[in-house]
């Protein structure tokens, strides 16, 4: 009986923490110098922004409408913070829809000097052989264009 209980327990999925997984990717890849980028990190500003508390991570739950993305961007204080990272389950949108959504958001927010970049696990972005994607979640990264 005890053996069966242990087997059942090991089969249970541990609840993932999307925010922590994305932060781990930022720390272990985005902020780390890489020879492909002349020994600079893929994003040379990421570590400083994160360490100074200038990055916010917002998880979009399965129950929320897409319109909450606009609400999150509208209420984000880009004077105090540099980047808003919106995290969604990879199955929420197709790669094509993710690109269309980012284009629509860019059309809406370009007059406010904002840039929205999308990252979907199935939209592989590479520089030579270096994959830049987070790989597990769909991300919308929102920041000022001119900063």
Question: Residue spans of the language-model regions?
Answer:
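Expand to "…catalyze enediolate/carbanion chemistry for C-C bond making/breaking, isomerization
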Residues: 2, 11-147
């Amino acid at each position: 009986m005890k053996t069966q209980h242990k087997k059942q327990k090991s089969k249970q999925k541990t609840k993932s923490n999307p925010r922590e997984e994305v932060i781990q990717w930022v720390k272990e890849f985005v902020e780390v110098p890489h020879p492909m980028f002349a020994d600079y990190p893929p994003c040379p500003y990421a570590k400083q922004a994160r360490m100074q508390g200038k990055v916010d991570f917002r998880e979009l739950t399965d129950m929320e409408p897409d319109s909450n993305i606009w609400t999150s961007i509208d209420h984000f204080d880009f004077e105090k913070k540099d980047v808003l990272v919106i995290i969604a389950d990879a199955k929420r949108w197709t790669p094509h829809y993710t690109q269309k959504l980012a284009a629509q958001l860019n059309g809406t927010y370009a007059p406010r000097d904002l840039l929205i970049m999308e990252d979907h696990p199935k939209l592989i972005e590479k520089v030579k052989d270096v994959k830049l994607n987070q790989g597990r979640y769909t991300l919308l990264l929102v920041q000022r264009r001119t900063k």
